[in-house]
Amino acid sequence: MQRHIRLAIYDLAKGNFQELAELAKGSMLPILSKEPGFVEYGVADIGNRQLCSITIWETREQAEKSVHLASSWVKDNVSDRVRLVTTYVGDLAFLAASPVYA
C-alpha cells in the first residue's frame, strides 16, 4: 500500500528542541491522530537549531491537508518559537522497521 509523507523543516527561534517536541507530542499529535488517514507523526532535532516534522498518511490528499493543519497549529501555538523553512509532500517508496520496532 502506497503511503505519503509530509516533511517540514523549521528554524528554532526561541526555546529548545525538547520543549517544542513535548508541546508537539501533547498538542499537535492529538489533532493529527484524529484525522482520517493518519499513520505516524514525529519530530527530529536535525542540528543547527533546526527541527524536522514528519507525518505519514494513507493518501497524498491527506498529506497535503496536513500542511494546513500544521500551519494553523504553529500559528496558534508556537509562532514565536519556530519559523518554517520549507515543506515537502511526497510519495513514500518504502518505510521498513526492525522487528523490534514493528
Model-derived features: where do they sit?
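Short S/T/G/P-rich N-terminal loop/turn motif that feeds into the first structured element of a domain
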Residues: M1-C52, E58-S72, V78-A102
